[in-house]
A protein has these predicted regions:
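Short hydrophobic/aromatic-rich motifs at helix boundaries and adjacent loops
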Residues: 15-16, 87-90, 129-131
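Rossmann-like NAD(P)-binding element
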Residues: 34-37, 49-115, 119-121
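Rossmann-fold dehydrogenase core element
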Residues: 116-134
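NAD(P)+-binding Rossmann beta1-loop-alpha1 motif at the extreme N-terminus of oxidoreductases
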Residues: 1-67, 95, 99, 128
Length: 135
């Protein structure tokens, strides 16, 4: 099974366009979107729409996403800052291994980023707070 170079969580406007940009530069990208009522099928719509025929690996669960990425894994989140980031980290950690990297591409408060660095590094992983969007 082909493995992705990076995993991306969040297929709203910023995440979708970032995934397309990475893929256009030669990266294979595993994509996942948190599911809320009425938003089921976001991943499939993306890979069968704007991502059709491109190097995307659809993931429908955190486990699928993590398993789809080459080691050491790099998982980037493009989701709303605050509690959603903490919740996603909690879901990711049990499936990741020492040396893996979690990147927060949202607009998180730097105090939250500093706290997350300590929490994630205590598990042997790396955490990068790299705000891309002010949204």
């Amino acid at each position: 099974m082909k493995k992705a170079d990076i995993g991306l969580i969040g297929l709203a406007v910023m995440g979708e366009n970032l995934a397309l940009n990475m893929e256009s530069k030669g990266f294979t990208v595993a994509v996942y979107n948190r599911s809320f009522p009425g938003e089921e099928g976001v991943v499939d719509r993306f890979v069968n729409g704007r991502g059709k025929g491109k190097n995307f690996i659809p993931a429908h669960s955190i486990e699928e996403l993590v398993e789809a990425v080459k080691r050491p894994r790099v998982i980037m989140m493009m989701i709303k800052a605050g509690a959603p980031v903490d919740e996603m980290i909690e879901q990711l950690l049990p499936h990741m291994s020492p040396g893996d990297v979690i990147i927060d591409g949202g607009n998180s408060d730097f105090h939250d980023t500093e706290r997350r660095v300590k929490e994630v590094e205590a598990k042997g992983l790396y955490f990068v707070g790299s705000g891309i969007s002010g949204g």
